[in-house]
Amino acid sequence: MDPRKPRQDPVNDARFYESLIKPPHLRTPDDIRNVYEQLRQLDTFSNLFIGPLKALCKTARYERHPAQYILFRDGDVARSWYILLSGSVFIENQIYMPYGCFGKRTGQNHRRTHNCLLLQESEMIVIDYPTEPQSNGMSPRTPPRGIHHSGEPVHQKTPRKSAPNMSVDSIAMPPPPVPPRPLRLPQTAAKGPAPLPPRGLPRTYPLDFPVDIPTTSSSSSNTSYNDQHRSQVYLNGLSADEDTLVRVKHRREKSNSVGGQAQNGISTARRLRGRSTASSTTTEGETASNEGADSDEDEGSMPSQESSSGGFMDLRDSVRECLEKEPSERNSEDLAVLLDFMQHMSAFAALPMSIKRQLCLKMVFAVVNDAGTVVLAHNEKLDSWSVIVNGCVEVVKPSGERVEYKLGDSFGAEPTPATQIHIGEMRTMVDDCEFVLVEHRDFCSIMSTIGDHIEKDRDGLTGEVVSEVERRTVGTHCGQVLIKGKPDKLIHHLVDERDHNVDPHYVDDFLLTYRVFIRDPTTIFEKLMLWFADSIYRDKVARLVLLWVNNHFNDFETNDEMWNLLERFEGALERDGMHSQLSLLNIACSVKAKPRQVILTRRKDDKMMMRLVGGQESGNSVYVAEVFPDTSAAREGVKRADEMLEVNQQSAKYLSAKKAEDLLTGSLSLTLMLKNNVLGYKETIGKIEHNKPKNGTSRSGAGIPMVIPVHKTSITGKKSSTTSSKSGMMEKLMTILKSSKEDSMDFTDEAKISSADLRPSRSNPDITSISQYYGPVRSECPEHVLKIYRNDQTFKYLPVYKETSAQNVVQLALQEFNMTAEGSPEWSLCECTVTIDGVIKQRRLPPQMENLAERIALNSRYYLKNNSRSEPLVPDELAPELLKEAQTQLLSLNAQVVAAQLTLQDFSVFSAIEPTEFLDNLFKLDSKYGSPKLEEFEQLFNREMWWVATEICTERHVQKRAKLIKKFIKVARYCRDLRNFNSMFAIMSGLDKPAVRRLHSSWERVSSKYIRMLDEIHQLVDPSRNMSKYRQHLAEVAQEPPVVPIYPVIKKDLTFAHDGNATYSEKLINFEKLRLIAKSIRGVMKLSSAPYEIASMAERSGGVVMDALLHMNSFENSNVATMRKGMSGKQNQPRKKVYEQALMVRKVKSYLEGLHVVDNEMELDSMSYDIEPQVQTAHRGANSSSTANIRRVPSPTPSSLSSQSAGSADQSSRHRLLFNGTGSISSAGGGSKFGVESPQAVQKMLSLVQNSKVKGAPPQITSPSTSARSSLQRNMPRVTGRQATSSAQGPVQLNEETSTVTTYYQSDNGRRQRSGSEGRFDNIPPSTFYLTSDGLTVSPRQSLSVVIPTHPHGHSPTSPRCRSRSPASSGCSSFSTIASIAATSMAAAPSAFVSNPYQHHQTVRGHVIGHRPMPIVTSGSATLPNHVSPRGLPPKSRPTILPGSHTNSSSRMGTIKEATFLTSEQVSRV
């Protein structure tokens, strides 16, 4: 393509800008349609329905602001959020590029938590939140730094540091010129060629462009029309005149993504009512140290029931709804849902996107209720192509060979017009099998057009195919998408002109996935450098490099060659005068760099290894100005612009450059903590240059490009003659960062301006470094309270900041104890600790030690000690008391605090995961960076899962065990309310361990309200249709991050996207596969794009989380947690209460850090049998017979019981094919078997569904006495133990889509693989499962923990016996097994297996069919009488399965450590 052609962008439409620029009250329906057609292409609105999106299009506004403009400040009321169209925005440590959204509210916080600076001239869409009353945390208050609407700072009564004159912010933007619109030139145009925005804009604009551009959207003055119209937008973003309110009613918990959180009277009353029932009875003592444990029987300590019933019990099954629609009734939203659901299925994996779309438009939905139904008879004509979307089927061929098809497999007609017949008999193997069918004629027509959509590009010399492109249609746009190609072609496509309407993420996907097929990234960068020399590609290459650095800075940090190329590119930007791009590059490098530890060794006669600049005397950190070659520093990777954070684990913020050099030359071994900070380094160099005499001849450093000098203003306000607009932008950026950190210092403005150096702030003395602009919690009052003792054991509570030093604490303590007459140098702060052995240790703290509240242990106290005395501060008789205070047990801890601490810890790891870690882990790449945080996140899931089982099985008292079970259910519920689904699922998995489920005496003491609570959580993770309910809910809450997703689901999606698609196809890179993986990773990364405001999220569910949770947690990441603004009402809390709250958090942290978990299934079984021995029955055979006779009646289809689907009952009666247990169609029109006598099965299905009716279960009449007896036993899981003998057990396969556990068998000589339900446990050691070749591929040195959670109570809480097998039935999934993959890296499986200690139990062989284990051959309690055939099994006359030959899967087997063994009681559930 010609690079000189205009760029194509997702919103590059002059009509769009013409419509958007119009005032909202002047827009016509055509204008709204123009805005809608463009916005619907953005990822921000990908999950938004038509109604809410059109409502936004009516009120969305256009704004354009100059570079260096402060859009909003920390503390301002958030009245709107933004979508960037062009330019770039800096918010804390993140740079936002075009088409990214920013400025959204977090939870119920209605105030900004960060400053926002425009780095370039930027255009944006402004979306106002609905107006709300001033209540709910919105009481008027003066922000920490008051500003006018133009961004001009105003002086407040309390002296604060003011930013320099920012008059540039108030400059009104001129109206645009007459079309065609020329290129925009920034203020630095005189210095060099101006860069284009990262993504261009249309070249023509309307003439009636408004001259008066609106000011910041945080302005309190808005047009009266906007105020009037915004009041008409409901909470879900739907306007009053829309007719799709029912469709988005389930999204009522959403707010920000569809226009905000309107706090109307109903929602306010609901929230207040929830708090009155959920938190008002939570007394003050509940947060104290001793009374902090919430009572299990207190309703007030329970999570809010209303929040659950509204947001989780009513989850729709959107996939089912879309499938049940007539093909002609499906719209674009339905199509998007179906494409997302089908993309992971093997039948669709190799098909082009255009073919998938056509198939989804033609497919019809069919349901087979009962297992054993004949779906296709032998020699029956095939008139459709079918895909299994739930369940599995089996084909028995005339030769006796059996072939099984599982979820995602296809069968039926081939895409040829010839008549085809089916060989063999196909039967369903489980209940509720679901299929999608495409008529043979339509299937042939669609598949015949594959060649029409694919174009191949061949080399002009060799004729070899170098790329394949597919023509796709997205909305109203049609364009070509590169799907396969040679590496060189993929690289060159970075600078080719692409149609961004149909392929907007190619650059992002390539920069993430190139490592799969290119080992050396320097080849890519060198080509970019060559293209940079061409003026045609220069701006485009500059944007590519900036995007690369901003998204994957670890590619440069861990590769010295890449770092050198980046410095070359930096010099090229300076040479060509591209200062704006260079500024962005410096900012990106500074904010994305991470601290690293370097160990330097030297000999006595070695010279200096590096040259340093800065230091305390200049008000800056110590920076590395130059690294000398052939030194230890060069070999260890020390770089120019590295900031020195620590030297031998001591802070370097008070070091001067001379002192640092002395340390380097005077030590033979040094441990340095370094962090690259180009921005701070260049500011330091700029200050040095500015302070030099004009005739000075000294150099600032060899080879240091002085690109962005920052010149300070004098007292008179005159700037240096060399100050330009670029330096003004950098000065303003640094001033914003500094003022945000110094706003609580009580210094006058005059004193700060007249100071030659920047005064260190309270929160960060080294303020010149942008890398130190970290602070998840910024409070205007002291965050901590210390309890300081004297030697007479009297104490005082002292409010302190996190940065208050030990020396300051001594001074405060002397004042509190009225000892001001004594000098503070005579006193010191000591920490007295009592060890487990009763030994009292005492140490004096350094005067400069900070963060004292987090440093102290539970078995320690702070004492005020006179330096002239040597008496012991803690007498011996107090030692036992200190040890008793240090003891922590789970039952004594507050469940909500435990859940919140788990959430913060998990999110701190999850948010630190780099996107490249997923690729490195998935493809097993040999990367220098690796996947450290991803592996840590994997371990967290396993640790939390094993912790639950260990804690319960360790407790020997049955009452306490029951309380522990209830405590864990509450913690899981709170985790769900906090959107920590990972910990929620881990806790559920721990509760569903067989060692826990078998504890009958404990479960029968768990009240029904906790069982209902557990059932609600189980419904959220219903495994049917690939956990569609969880995925739907995740898609909704993902619009308002943060969220901690379920890691096993992420791992499974990535694994099957990798295994189900080839990386190479005909010597070409299958980039479509890499797109799919990159899309999944991109969605996961968005979940951690905002910090946790955990207090607001807790209030949303009716609870209250103390501020101490955030104050007592220091994280490596800056965006882990944040405080809600406007918390002044909590500043007057008593010191004692604040201390007790912090003490509870310290106890929770100490408990979680000291967890000892048992990760061995057999050991847990032994512990479980020890605390609750197996109850032996007298007549197992009779018991089995009675069990077999209690068979449930046939259950209706899930959609008939699904209350989540709007209009599901009506559509189910029209569009579902229902079959009874005998194989006949349940309809008024006939009873013939499915497809046996009909040559046109599809037409027959479509005609029969009009008259088909749902088969309901007959009502069950029970007497009150029976109900009472049943209610006493309903919470007891019917599990008798894990029985095993020396006979071997069979391996278990993991189904890709539903995460169900199915069994197959295979001998050492290579028996035929089985992916279905039948399996024999032969020749496999106990507790060992294997994966098949079409499942997860596991290396021999890795293993997977198979998590199989089930309902522990065994029965439905609403009926004595659960009647339905449908997971959609409320409370009726007790007999199903939620099988999930915890695909985590664990230790290699041992070569020798521990023998089962319970050899006297007999072996059970069984089916695992659709989540339900079913017996086929039993000995012992699970024996079935001969006349009873377990439902769902093939006939008993089925021939014995002969072993086949399948050697490939044997070579790919990996041991799954400690998997779950099915007990006889489990398989007896029929």
UniProtKB/Swiss-Prot annotation:
UniProt xrefs under CDD domains: CAP_ED, RA_PDZ-GEF1, RasGEF, REM
Domain N-terminal Ras-GEF: residue ranges: 478-592
Expressing tissues: Expressed in hermaphrodite-specific neurons (HSNs), oviduct sheath cells and lateral seam cells.
Residue spans of biased composition, Low complexity class: 184-193, 215-224, 275-292, 1198-1211, 1349-1370
Keywords: GTPase activation, Guanine-nucleotide releasing factor
Segments forming domain Ras-GEF: 894-1124
PROSITE patterns in the cross-refs: CNMP_BINDING_3, PDZ, RA, RASGEF, RASGEF_CAT, RASGEF_NTER
Residue span, Ras-associating domain: 782-869
GO molecular function, one term: guanyl-nucleotide exchange factor activity
Domain PDZ: residue ranges: 597-679
UniProt keyword DNA damage, yes or no: no
Disruption phenotype: Beginning in the L2 stage, onward, animals display striking and progressive defects in morphology of the epidermis. Worms show molting defect and exhibit a trail of old cuticle that remains attached to the posterior part of the body. Longitudinal ridges termed alae, which are cuticular structures secreted by lateral hypodermal seam cells, are poorly distinct or interrupted. Sensory rays in males are malformed. Developed a fairly normal gonad but have a strongly reduced fertility. Show uncoordinated movement and an enlarged gut lumen.
Biased amino acid composition, Polar residues: 256-266, 1176-1189, 1260-1274, 1282-1308
Bias-annotated ranges (Pro residues): 173-183
Bias (Basic and acidic residues): 1309-1321
Job of this protein: Acts as a guanine nucleotide exchange factor for small G protein GTPases like rap-1 and rap-2. Required in the hypodermis, especially in the seam cells, for proper formation of the cuticle.
Annotated family: Belongs to the RAPGEF2 family.
Protein name (Swiss-Prot/TrEMBL): Rap guanine nucleotide exchange factor
Gene of this entry: pxf-1
